[in-house]
Amino acid sequence: MQSCITVIGERDVVLGFRLLGITNTIVAEGKDLVKKFMEEFENPHCSVIVVSEHLKNMIDKKTLRSIEVSSKPLVVFIPLPGFKEEESIETMAKRILGIDIGSV
């Protein structure tokens, strides 16, 4: 069974990951962003989804909670350049995985 890393978001977000060699990328905004994200979230072959932080404001709290506690696929929200990051990687790892990587 092959797993994948998917990047979904605005053009600026996706372009950076394409330059790093990630080929499974989807440019989407607004309602299309939510639709494309949910399709990938339900894909059993998808291991990691990197998505624009704007998605958090577009989905209901119940769905957001299930996304935040999911480990397969692991969802990583990234801010757009110029926007404040809400949660550090260390905090997210501790919340999702129960591991404090800040003291490593």
Swiss-Prot record:
Membrane topology: Peripheral membrane protein
Subcellular location: Cell membrane
Keyword flag Manganese: no
Key word Membrane present: yes
InterPro entries associated with the record: ATPase_V1-cplx_f_g_su, ATPase_V1-cplx_fsu_bac/arc, ATPase_V1_fsu_sf
GO biological-process terms attached to the record: proton motive force-driven plasma membrane ATP synthesis
A GO molecular function held by the record: proton-transporting ATP synthase activity, rotational mechanism
Gene3D superfamilies, alphabetized: ATPase, V1 complex, subunit F
Keyword annotations of the record: ATP synthesis, Cell membrane, Hydrogen ion transport, Ion transport, Membrane, Transport
A single GO cellular-component term on record: plasma membrane
Top-level lineage group: Archaea
One Pfam family of this chain: ATP-synt_F
Family label: Belongs to the V-ATPase F subunit family.
Functional summary from the UniProt entry: Component of the A-type ATP synthase that produces ATP from ADP in the presence of a proton gradient across the membrane.
Subunit structure as annotated in this protein's UniProt entry: Has multiple subunits with at least A(3), B(3), C, D, E, F, H, I and proteolipid K(x).
Protein name: A-type ATP synthase subunit F
Native species: Thermoplasma volcanium (strain ATCC 51530 / DSM 4299 / JCM 9571 / NBRC 15438 / GSS1)
